[in-house]
Amino acid sequence: MAKVRAALDRITDPSVKAVLNEEAYSHIRPVLRESLTNNPYAIAPDAADTLEKYGIATNPFAVKVHSHGAVKSIENTLLERVGFNLPKEPCTFLFLKRSKLRYLRRGPSNNDIFINLAIEPRDLQRYEEDTLVESWTRITTRYAYISDTFHFFTRKMLADLFFHNPALDVLYATLVLPPEALHKHPSIEPDLYTINYNFNGFQYIPGNHGGGSYSHEFKQLEWLKVGHLKSPELCLTFQMIESIGANHLFMITRGIKITPRVRTFTKDSYVLFPQIFHPRNLNPSKPFPKVKAMQLFTYVKSVKNPTERDIYAKIRQLIKTSELSDYHPDEIVHIVNYFVFISKLDSINSYSDILSLPIWSKALLPIKTKITQLWEKLTGARAFNQLLDALQWKTFTYPLEVVDSPQPLQTRDCFIEDERLEIDTLEDEIPPNPNDNTSMSPQSIEEAVKNNPDLPWAPWLLILQAHNADCTEKQYDPENNLILPIQEINTLPKHQHPDIPTDLLTLLTKLHREPTTVSLDNHRARAYGSDVKNLRIGALLKKQSKDWLASFALKTENIEREVLMSVIHGAGGSGKSHAIQTWMRSLNRRDRHVTIILPTTDLRNDWTNKVPNLEQANFKTFEKALCQPCGKIIVFDDYSKLPQGYIEAFLAINQNVILAILTGDSKQSFHHESNEDAYTATLEPSIITYQPFCRYYLNITHRNKPDLANKLGVYSCSSGTTSFTMSSQALKGMPILSPSIMKKTALGEMGQKSMTYAGCQGLTTKAVQILLDTNTPLCSSNVIYTALSRAVDHIHFINTGPNSTDFWEKLDSTPYLKTFLDCVREEKMNEIIAAEEPPTPVQAPTTHFPKVNPTTVIESYVHDLPEKHDREIFSETHGHSNAIQTDNPVVQLFPHQQAKDETLYWATIEARLQCTSSEENLKEFHLKHDIGDILFLNYKQAMNLPQDPIPFNPDLWTLCRQEIENTYLKKSAAALVNAATRQSPDFDSHAIALFLKSQWVKKTEKIGCLKIKAGQTIAAFMQQTVMIYGTMARYMRKFRNQYCPRKIFVNCETTPADFNSFILDEWNFNRTCFSNDFTAFDQSQDGSILQFEVIKAKFHNIPEDVIEGYIQIKTHAKIFLGTLSIMRLSGEGPTFDANTEANIAYTHTKFNIPCDAAQVYAGDDMSIDYVASVKPSFNMIEHLMKLKGKPVFNTQTQGDFAEFCGWTISPKGIIKKPEKMNMSIELQKNINKFHEVKRSYALDHAFAYQLGDELHELYNENEAEHHQLATRSLILAGQATALDILDYGLRDLK
């Protein structure tokens, strides 16, 4: 597999990788779908890993929560195993709910029998009432199954069960008994279940949830050992078929058969230490994990003179915090004493070797050895023999030897001979309603009118009540007109069909929606058929074969057909589909005589969620419904959004349809055909065609509050008020409705949930945002009505244009928007309440890390280092570079790049810089305008910048200029004198003085690198240029800090305490995080990044001459070799800010990043606590950008956390990577500079040091060793006070 993986890693072609990913996904998708059958739960990662060990997959996208979902998935898996073993003939199920049949892969056709005896009170609500019996009844099938109750049986009960049911041959039984309970040990699978021992028994607790626990007696554990059960009349044989954790599946058959002699529940992974102390009770007595025992043994033998405290610290390091409760303090004390003892014993063989002895000594050696052994028996064994005896660990095992019943059992008659359980089949019917009437009687109408004489709709009150609407008060629209809940009444004949289900017909009659006969319009069907045949419309239909298209058009050519229809019109939120969905929820899962046709995938998903009992094949999008068989009853939901002529064409080709139910709203938007050449584009909307066949329009809503609904002319059955707000910016977490598809697409690409005004039909949400722009006046009243009726509680208007009379003219353009004008203006600000002071954090308990041998740690780095010149860069002109210095192996681990190194200087120029011409740079700049625009739109959305350009503030610009000048003047006089040349007005404003940066390379991945790589350049611009564009960067930084979202942290002008506070408050450690490792970040910032910077500067209204000057220096920058290509240079002035903002723009252009994802940025460094998917649009522009990023993923588990700016991001806060810290200290020691940096190192190290015992949850063994060495070095250097004080204020973060 390693060679296959290596071959795949060598593939770099993106198209080939895409094919491989698609192929892999095609295999992954069915596995994930199948896993939801037995394990539909959201499982904790550790429990999911345990389940995977047992072959049970967990869908990482599952969101269903269960208190002990992992154990439930085991139960379901065993049920599936039982179902595979059972024959297709009828079987008897004892103590099993009928709903569990789906896990057994069985259905009603198997005619299975259910017998459930109510033994405890909760059995009455656990099992179906028709399966409960007061006493046992006869089992007449050959196979039976007892579900998770068998452990409560006695042996005699089981013998009686077989004796009195001669037809029963095979009994499958599942029982829940943890084998470790035989030894009173803690759970061997603590991620799945735990065990309490008390009251002379034990409690099995699944998922650590006490509410689902079972109390057991120790005698019940004997079932795990039973091999044969004998009585005078029969003999039963037991065989364990499957064992997963504490759940076991047994097969019990008649007769004496062979069964395995040993039952294995788990592999042997524990050992018992020998009894080396007296008295015996002062020795370790409980099993200890063998892996941890070996780790402790090798530790005490690898460290010189380990102390008792060191061994305690090592044990604490090896045992997870979550596992500490499984150990007793006295047992830990005995284990420590055991290892202290063997640490003092000599492990060097003290006996004579035979290789160095002469021949006569070899002949006498056995005699000498025998005498020595006799002497040691008298005086005591040598230290080496003592060690070997002390290491005779005994393997502890949980497997059991099976036993037979100790004595024959006497059976007794405990079954009823003359009774047999009768299983009644449930009929699909709606429970009777006390107010249910098949029609409105004259008496009921008369009574309603009498009780409500002032209501014009009093005769309709019973029908309104059937829609859960209590319309007994009057409501008025803004013009003070009375709003009628029932409108557009049509008197129509009532027709029936004998095949329509009675309960459905009763429901329609109750709602006064009886079917009526409708003649199909041949012209509409023919127009749709022609458009489909000639590929003018459709997406899926265009992929059908020519024969299918021709056949479809022929079937729609001439139709003369009448169909029963129930047309249901009503306002948004009136519950048009609610009654139909309620009826459908009473149907059998495999019922196929009803098909629901939906205009959109979102609406289809909504129906499948609301009617989960039917298979998804019953719900079809409209195009797929034409290509697949359908039922005899069709529901066209939101049919106004279906293409014109679709309904007629569908009914023309599906002659089996006996009833069509149409639901829609004549006040909302309808389907618009964008292809003007299509015949269907000239047809009138379907809502108009079928409105005459609707008996009445239900003008009520359960969705909108009265203040909103009444303005729309709709009667509200809800209470409360709607909140209206308006601003020029979008709010987070709310869908946006836009008037155009273009805006909707752009917003969607930036991760914002968006829909068009017309496309939001069917949406119901707590709050919605409505985007107002120049396209709003072009929208029809129906479309505006659709958008305004989506929200339940809050509507936020986004005005992207100037806040002037032009904006209010937009509101005047439609009849609805104007009514909300006053509401927006009168909205009051919520009172701001100061937050309470956070409680003082509790200081972590101190800890002690085990002693580590520093020589051993350093040796792992230096033993593979090649000779100096094999690592250096060689140039024929300048010879070898000089980055590897001194003969000290520790110093040689760290390359030292120096400005005077000519070989490295030219190698850096060749690797980092590329020359071209100013004309090519300008061409590159202008060709990348569109990409720069996309980058800025994503940056603007990510950083929450205002919609309108930011007005220029001269005072703020002056302030930023002063800050830049003050910072520059803080340099020493010598530094200012050295830069005198660049301060001269004669210095070319486009010229760059180039230097090699002197530095020690201390990155963790570069420690001990085998080959020296190119360094970094410093580009020295004219000082006036640096000052101007440094001012520009600082000016825009002020606004970036002002608008920066809470979830984004930019590490600029901040302290480690600020960063630490952000991580603790915002970072999510419950998922994999993501970083972007850029390749040649500075060199890759081409014309697209420059365009982004220019657009960003113009948005901040930076003076035009400053922007033009910036373009000049970026496109005309030159060194002694010629003009440089457009790239980022270190001495520009805005380098750090520009890099950071380019990083943000690129990341948000490439990835779909949710608003709740915490993000950190600094230059080319970044990390996000979420694995974001790549936007489809990025694939279209990726090849046009030089900037490339390689994703790096961290699981955020022990030893695998994200790194950012030299800090490790952990659940306890930020900490320095211990490996880098320790190795940096070693370098400073060996170059005699440690005294200069020890305090700053101590202050950084304090973030980890003060976490104390919590570090065991963060560090792996290697990191713990480096942490111990770094801590020891700093304390010996006198920095204990700095480690405790922590000047950054970690203990009092604000």
From Swiss-Prot:
Residues 699-832 form the (+)RNA virus helicase C-terminal domain. GO terms for molecular function: ATP binding; ATP hydrolysis activity; mRNA methyltransferase activity; RNA binding; RNA helicase activity; RNA-directed RNA polymerase activity. Residues 541-698 form the (+)RNA virus helicase ATP-binding domain. Keywords: ATP-binding, Helicase, Hydrolase, Multifunctional enzyme, Nucleotide-binding, Nucleotidyltransferase, RNA-directed RNA polymerase, Transferase, Viral RNA replication. Pfam families: RdRP_2, Viral_helicase1, Vmethyltransf. The keyword Chloroplast does not apply. Residues 1071-1178 form the RdRp catalytic domain. ATP binds at residues 570-577. It catalyses: RNA(n) + a ribonucleoside 5'-triphosphate = RNA(n+1) + diphosphate; ATP + H2O = ADP + phosphate + H(+). One of its GO terms (biological process) is viral RNA genome replication. The keyword S-adenosyl-L-methionine does not apply. Its EC number is 2.7.7.48, 3.6.4.13. Residues 59-224 form the Alphavirus-like MT domain. RNA replication. The central part of this protein possibly functions as an ATP-binding helicase. Belongs to the potexvirus/carlavirus RNA replication protein family. This is RNA replication protein. It comes from White clover mosaic virus (strain O) (WCMV).
